Amino acid sequence: MSRIGKKPINLPQNINITIIENNVQIQGPKGELSYKIPKLIQIKQDTKNNKLFLYKTEDNKEAQKLHGLCRTLINNMIIGVSQGFEKKLQIQGVGYRSQLDGDNLLLNVGYSHTVIVKPPKNIILEVENNTSITIKGIQKEQVGEIAAQIRRIRPPEPYKGKGIRYLNETINLKVGKSGK
């Protein structure tokens, strides 16, 4: 049995959950998300204690894999619609900067052109002091994916550390060539 899957999910007071067959719809103050549960997993709601429980309908390897996965995905959806998720990026380098143009993010990171990043409709980008970018949204996977796409534009280089990095990410710097 999955150690993660057998844990109950606590529901905050401001969350509404509707379960119709294998579809779970979660509504909260930040928005609304839905998820289709695989047939190998069954979900039950305890309205007295405000908890959700997930059970396996079969006892095979695939059901074991999906048990913990479904519980984690539903828990992340609940956190997303109640609190939201955010990732922070830092830009380091001489002349490297970012700015917002409407919803689009404009990056000047050492290329001959400005790189334009167009976020999906439910992702909010914020820029503070031209060198830090905050990505906010209700879907954890989507927030992380957009952050990874922005970082991939100019990843930190190993000699001086110039580039786009996650906040508090440590870069192992290499020692340059020694002179003769």
Swiss-Prot record:
Q: Name one GO cellular component term.
A: cytosolic large ribosomal subunit
Q: Which UniProt keywords apply?
A: Chloroplast, Plastid, Ribonucleoprotein, Ribosomal protein, RNA-binding, rRNA-binding
SUPFAM superfamilies assigned to the protein according to its UniProt record, in alphabetical order: Ribosomal protein L6
Query: Can you provide one Gene Ontology molecular function annotated for this UniProt record?
Result: structural constituent of ribosome
GO BP term, example: cytoplasmic translation
Major location category of this protein: plastid
Name where it's found.
Answer: Plastid, Chloroplast
The record's subunit annotation is: Part of the 50S ribosomal subunit.
HAMAP family recorded: Ribosomal_uL6_B
Identify the PANTHER family for this entry.
Answer: 60S/50S RIBOSOMAL PROTEIN L6/L9, LARGE RIBOSOMAL SUBUNIT PROTEIN UL6M
| Alphabetical list of NCBIfam families matching this protein | L6_bact
Q: What does this protein do?
A: Binds 23S rRNA.
Family as reported in the entry's similarity comment = Belongs to the universal ribosomal protein uL6 family.
Name this protein carries in UniProt:
Large ribosomal subunit protein uL6c
